Every structure is written in structure tokens, then in C-alpha cells.
């Protein structure tokens, strides 16, 4: 389905200042390099300014400073990237689900499904589950016993919710995600691992997004908790009892060990790992591949990953790391010897 919106309508939608033809028809979005004569683009990152003069876009989202030297159609906004985010939903080709229950769905007698919800083929909804208004369940989703999905939720095909998973409003969960799987809990008895029942659940706040193949384990006793507005990328592992504060975002392949607490408005880049039973305060940024081994009490950016080098240089650096203990001992010896020399450069009476 092709959407056509006039440039003037987009300006009104954004509250933007229009420079150019308000009747210009816009049919889609594209990058500066690839946009055609009916598509809207944007300039948010200065490194792409070099493409501004040659773009074929019908119109651009620009800051005022960039719009001054641009002769084409423009929507002038304070933040072009944020404006692009808002407009993107107007051109989203994702099919809209229709209300109703597919005849192949299996629904427990005491489950409650709002009439406005869309339940796709081969969905399973177990006893005591509750599905809110305008919820979409894609094909082959499983909603476990006593689990709840708040209004406006959207679950892609093959999402699995175990029992006692509570999901807030307007939550988006992508395919393959598993919420409420048993946490990794075992007690050691003379070298043999004894399983610990995971009797907590999972609680997800409002406006959360959960990526493809991400796993959020149920709590051992209390719930694993994901706050409002949290954004989780693909292939993230969140262990039992973890708590994630509101509006924290995590990129792919983050791993969080059990009982760790992460504050509000944090950002975790790809491949970050956290040990268990630590606390991360609000407004912390962890760069890619950082390994967090203790609590963080001060906001700011933290790193521990090794930056990329040419392979030959990296091998030399790795070899030097193995020599650090010896270098440290030699440095201490030099410091001791230098301390035995008097200020005038002569050896002390102690020789």
C-alpha cells in the first residue's frame, strides 16, 4: 500500500516551518543518497552534509542552519532525526491486524480476550490469561497461564510468554522472544547441582520494545522487572531477578547476570556484560564490549573493551600485557634505587 501525503500536511503534523511547495506529494522516506523525486529525507548527522547538494529528494527535514543554504523544499525543525522518527509511522507498510480470533487458535475457557484484539493462526492462550484491548498476537504465539497483556500490545509471530508474565500497555515484542523462562538457579550438593524452582514472574512496564530472540527469565522469588519505556535490541539475555529502570536502552547481545539492578535512562552498547548482584545508577553509558564487574555509583560513560588495532599491533600489545607483572617489578626497583640518590646527584651514605 502506497501512502501519499502533501508536504504542507507533514509540516502541520510536525509543527515545522515549511520552505517550498506545500502541495508537493510525498510517497515515502529514504536516505539523502537514495531518495527519489517523491521521497522525503533528512540531515541529522553532519558527516552526511556532503550529500546535500546532490540529493534528488522531494524535500528534506533540516535544521535552520542547514536550510539557509538549501534551495529545495524543506521542513525546518529543531531535531531532524526526531522529526523523521515521528513521520516514519505515517509511511510504515506493516499490515494492520483486524479484530477477531482465528479458527485455529486454542484458547482456554477461562481466558479473557478483549473483542478488539486480533488473535492469529495457531495462537495458544492458556488458563486465566487476559488479553487487553487492541492487542495483536501473531501466528503461533503462546500466552501462558495467568499472563496478562495490556492494551495496544503487539506480539510478532512465535513470541512465547510463560505463566505469570505481566505486560503493560503498548508493548512491542518481536519474533522468537521468550519471557518468563526459568532462571538459571541451582544449589550445589557435594558436586551435584540441585535445581531451584523459579517461582517469581516477569513484569514489563508500558511502552517497552523487546527485540528478536531476546530472553527475559522469571524471578526466583520476586519478579524480574523491566521499567516503562525500556528498549531492548535483539539477542539480549536478562537473567532472573534483574531490575531495569525506566527508559533504559540496550543494543544487541547484552548479557545481564542475576539480581543486577540497572537504573533509569542508561544506555548499554552491543556486547556489554554485567556480573550478578550489582547496582548501576541512573544515567550510565556503557560502551561496546564493556565487562562490568562491580557496582557503578556515579553517572557517566564507562568502558573496558579493547579498541580495534591492526592485527600485528594488537599481537604486540597482547604480548606486552603478559609482561606487565615483570615491568611493574622492574619499575618498583628503579623507583627504589632512584630514592637512594641524594638531590645533588650523589649516592647517599648508605650507598
Swiss-Prot record:
Its EC number is 2.3.1.191. One of its GO terms (biological process) is lipid A biosynthetic process. The active site is at residue 240. SUPFAM superfamilies: Trimeric LpxA-like enzymes. Keywords: Acyltransferase, Lipid A biosynthesis, Lipid biosynthesis, Lipid metabolism, Repeat, Transferase. It catalyses: a UDP-3-O-[(3R)-3-hydroxyacyl]-alpha-D-glucosamine + a (3R)-hydroxyacyl-[ACP] = a UDP-2-N,3-O-bis[(3R)-3-hydroxyacyl]-alpha-D-glucosamine + holo-[ACP] + H(+). InterPro entries: Hexapep (IPR001451), Hexapep_transf_CS (IPR018357), LpxD (IPR007691), Trimer_LpxA-like_sf (IPR011004), UDP_GlcNAc_AcTrfase_non-rep (IPR020573). Pathway: Bacterial outer membrane biogenesis; LPS lipid A biosynthesis. GO terms for cellular component: membrane. Gene3D superfamilies: 1.20.5.170, Hexapeptide repeat proteins, MurE/MurF, N-terminal domain. One of its GO terms (molecular function) is N-acyltransferase activity. It is an enzyme of class 2 (transferase). Belongs to the transferase hexapeptide repeat family. LpxD subfamily. HAMAP family: LpxD. Homotrimer. Catalyzes the N-acylation of UDP-3-O-acylglucosamine using 3-hydroxyacyl-ACP as the acyl donor. Is involved in the biosynthesis of lipid A, a phosphorylated glycolipid that anchors the lipopolysaccharide to the outer membrane of the cell. This is UDP-3-O-acylglucosamine N-acyltransferase. The lineage of its organism: Bacteria, Pseudomonadati, Pseudomonadota, Gammaproteobacteria, Pseudomonadales.
